[in-house]
Design a protein with these regions (language model features):
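Sec-dependent bacterial lipoprotein signal peptides
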Residues: 1-18
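Ser/Thr-rich, Pro/Gly/Ala-heavy low-complexity intrinsically disordered linkers and tails
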Residues: 18-113
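C-terminal His-loop and adjacent cap/lid subdomain of alpha/beta-hydrolase
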Residues: 111-794
């Protein structure tokens, strides 16, 4: 092999893989958005033309006169690559009548939402858009930043990005951001460039210093084919080693191992863009200079013979509309199958939001993937919003509302309420603006919590329709070219998915219905029962923690999000919480049950009913207070157990936080998946495991994680003892680890006082009166009952 195991071990750090704060973001105010190191789209024609030809040999204008019978690994090249396509699509990506230029009828039903099957998309053609794609508007185009040039003109109605001529005159506008497909070639020279990477390659004038790569026992020329274009409005990329390719219409698959790796990206995005900064920086032409950049040009996996597929529309930093992104993933795979060849196996890989996508797509599109390797996992996005909302409500209570109470001055005590990890003495908080050894604004001593280090910034991003990072290139583009549209756009997770959740009939501004709810939640219940907090502290917490005001009433964020004035300090988004109303009992927030039902019906909730071999890789990041906590793989397993009664297809492999351990673990997972699928049964060595630094196996077996899913004392298996699993705020309130209750069923407070909910505690008449003020009308959560929003016919 050209690449050795020690080189694979030296792959990118976890930070580069995750990029949940964009591309190596350092600014804490950019949490969960994207940090664009590329230029803003919408530049002059001269600059975008240059951007599209700076690297590789573009074949966008190449034509093939050859006519051959399609064979495995090739496609029918009998087409020219001008703006008239042969698949019944126009250059703006819209579907036509399904009749090709040679008269062949291509009308077929597909599950991509289109009326025709428009694949393959050849060089010079623009990929299709599914008929039921909601075509969100505004929609920032990023093709120029990625290296595909200005997008195609698709309207003269001044909608979208203005497309400029040679003298910067406006020729038209692009709303759908289509770009013609192109293929670039790169190669590894015998003497690699300083810093590694590849060099541009011209297949019609090949250099004489191409390195050789051993694949399948044969030496192959190290030449990479890199195809990019737009499908379903998003930019896709497909790369594979193609040693002898000379015609982009006929992919050379002689070095392919017959496996497709679909790499899914993470991050938290709220839509209205073709690609976030994270996605741009994985698809740009110049990524050939970065040999270990996760994405389509990741050399270690190419060197093993994998073809790699990627799309800006399967990066959750772009959008969390998993209905749309799943549709896009299916279409990208169709392009691969039509242009290249149906793979023997398709493996999923991705961290964070990339892990979520694998689970959701295995559920909603079971034919897309054969094996899953989710890392830094969550069950889904929508049930994570529940915990995200709790974090700032609780931190504001600890810091401000009850900030004088010494109970909350230790981080360990806060953890008893939040459930997530917190560390007294933790150093290096991203939110320590004043260098005090703790997050600025905190009433506690030195230290921090996962609520802050992992989740701070997600509340304004996901919940406030008025706030968006206008410095991110996508949103700066919209603000520059369509300021009125920008001002009228609601920037929230739910509004990005308004076609799923529907418009809230109570909103005068047309905002989407929401799924967030904390009615009846008894924050800190477990801490109360274990004696960690007093009855008076429990009562005060639940009276004052509150919820969120209606989106119609929300105001712009303070410093450091919306306002740049430190005197307007509000890291908790407290101005948009009901605690700010100053009432004796701060009102809770109630979900729209119709929105919750749509979340289930439309496949946004991971239900656990999948049978794909799944190996969850969990870097143990609790000491870093990272948002990717150790509870999540076990929430996945619990949902599988609840759905199927077993989870034999699911493995949990924990590794250290050392970045060098990550990709070797992924390689082992791929080998295990291949053996599993080849034999059509689970290998005997496919077991739960945990490793320490250097990928040193510590323990494996069915009891390795004993205790992680139980509450029995002294029941921890060796892996659970090595890597402790924490909980979250709703588990502290009585929910189980599956974390899938949007709106709890409630029982009357009088019932709770009598049925043992409070253990052996006794309450005075004044204390009962105080509890009645909080929970008398709503009751308290009864987590023995299912989610009120879960449809009975699901």
């Amino acid at each position: 092999m050209y690449v050795s195991s020690h080189r694979l071990a030296a792959a990118l750090t976890l930070t580069a893989l995750l990029a949940c704060n964009g591309d190596d973001a350092a600014d804490p105010t950019a949490t969960a958005t994207d940090t664009d190191t590329d230029t803003s789209a919408g530049t002059s024609a001269a600059s975008t033309t240059a951007a599209s030809t700076t690297a590789g040999t573009t074949t966008a204008s190449s034509e093939s006169d050859a006519t051959t019978d399609p064979t495995p690994g090739t496609t029918d090249p009998s087409t020219t690559t001008d703006s008239t396509t042969t698949d019944g699509t126009t250059t703006d990506g819209t579907t036509t009548d399904g009749v090709t230029t040679d008269g062949t009828d291509t009308d077929t039903d597909t599950d991509t939402g289109g009326a025709i099957d428009p694949f393959p998309v050849y060089v010079g053609e623009v990929g299709p858009i599914a008929e039921d794609n909601p075509r969100q508007f505004p929609f920032a185009c990023r093709t120029a930043d990625i290296g595909l040039g200005q997008p195609e003109i698709d309207n003269q109605d001044a909608e979208g990005l203005p497309i400029l001529g040679d003298n910067d005159e406006v020729l038209g506008w692009s709303r759908d951001c289509g770009a013609k497909t192109r293929v670039d070639y790169f190669y590894k020279p015998i003497v690699p460039p300083e810093g590694g990477g590849l060099l541009p390659y011209d297949p019609l004038d090949p250099p004489d210093d191409v390195a050789m790569l051993e694949l399948n026992g044969e030496l192959r020329r190290y030449v990479v084919r890199y195809e990019r274009g737009t499908i379903n409005r998003f930019v896709y990329g497909i790369a594979v080693i193609a040693p002898e390719e000379t015609d982009p219409a006929i992919p050379d698959l002689s070095a392919w191992n017959e496996r497709l790796l679909f790499w899914f990206g993470g991050g938290v995005g709220i839509g209205y863009q073709q690609a976030s900064g994270l996605a741009v920086n994985r698809l740009r032409t110049d990524t050939y200079k970065q040999p270990l950049r996760d994405g389509p040009l990741f050399e270690p996996f190419l060197e093993q013979g994998y073809a790699i597929a990627y799309s800006s529309g399967t990066v959750t930093d772009t959008t969390y509309n998993l209905e749309l992104t799943g549709q896009t993933a299916v279409m990208v795979k169709k392009q691969f199958e039509a242009m290249y060849y149906p793979p023997k196996y398709t493996f999923g890989l991705g961290a964070s939001g990339g892990a979520i996508q694998q689970l959701i797509y295995a559920q909603n599109h079971p034919e897309l993937l054969d094996g899953l390797v989710p890392t830094h996992s969550y069950t889904d996005m929508i049930t994570q919003t529940i915990r995200v909302g709790d974090c700032e409500l609780l931190e504001h209570y600890f810091d401000v509302t009850d900030g004088a109470n010494p109970t909350w001055h230790t981080w360990a005590k806060r953890a008893k309420i939040e459930g997530l990890n917190a560390i007294d003495g933790y150093q290096g908080s991203d939110w320590d603006f004043l260098q005090q050894g703790k997050p600025t604004g905190s009433s506690a001593g030195p230290g921090s919590s996962e609520c802050i280090e992992g989740w701070r910034g997600l509340t304004p991003l996901a919940m406030n329709p008025l706030w968006v990072d206008a410095n991110a290139a996508s949103y700066k583009q919209i603000l520059t070219h369509q300021p009125d549209v920008f001002a009228d756009t609601p920037w929230t997770y739910w509004d990005d998915l308004v076609t799923i959740f529907g418009v809230d009939p109570k909103s005068n501004k047309g905002y989407a219905r929401r799924t967030w709810d904390n009615v009846g939640v008894q924050y800190g219940l477990t801490a109360l029962l274990s004696g960690q907090i007093s009855k008076s502290e429990f009562i005060a917490l639940n009276a004052k923690v509150g919820g969120f005001i209606a989106p119609d009433d929300m105001v712009q964020e303070g410093f450091p999000f919306g306002s740049q004035d430190p005197q307007d300090f509000d890291v908790w988004s407290a101005r948009n919480g009901t605690a700010s109303l100053g009432l004796p009992v701060a009102p809770r927030t109630e979900a729209d049950l119709g929105a919750v039902q749509e979340a289930y019906y439309r496949g946004l909730v991971f239900l656990g009913d999948i049978d794909h071999p799944t190996i969850t890789i969990m870097p143990y990041l609790e000491p870093q207070l990272d948002m990717h906590n150790a509870k999540q793989p076990f929430a996945i397993r619990e949902r599988m157990l609840e759905a199927k009664g077993e989870a034999d297809n699911h493995l949990i492999w924990a590794i250290s936080s050392e970045g060098a351990d990550f990709y070797p673990a992924v390689g082992l997972a791929f080998d295990t998946l291949a053996a599993w699928l080849d034999s059509k049964k689970k290998p005997v060595d496919a077991l739960d495991r945990c490793y320490t630094a250097g990928l040193s196996l510590t323990a494996e077996g069915p009891d390795a994680w004993s205790g992680a899913l139980t509450s029995q004392p002294d029941d921890d298996g060796p892996c659970a003892a090595l890597y402790p699993v924490y909980s979250d705020s709703r588990m502290v309130a009585g929910e189980d680890i599956s974390g899938d209750i949007f709106k709890c069923a409630t029982k009357p407070l009088t019932t709770a006082l009598a049925d043992g909910t409070y253990g052996a505690l006794t309450w005075s008449p004044d204390e009962i009166a105080a509890l009645e003020q909080i929970f008398g009308e709503t009751g308290v959560c009864d987590y023995s009952k299912p989610d009120l929003g879960r449809p009975e016919d699901l």
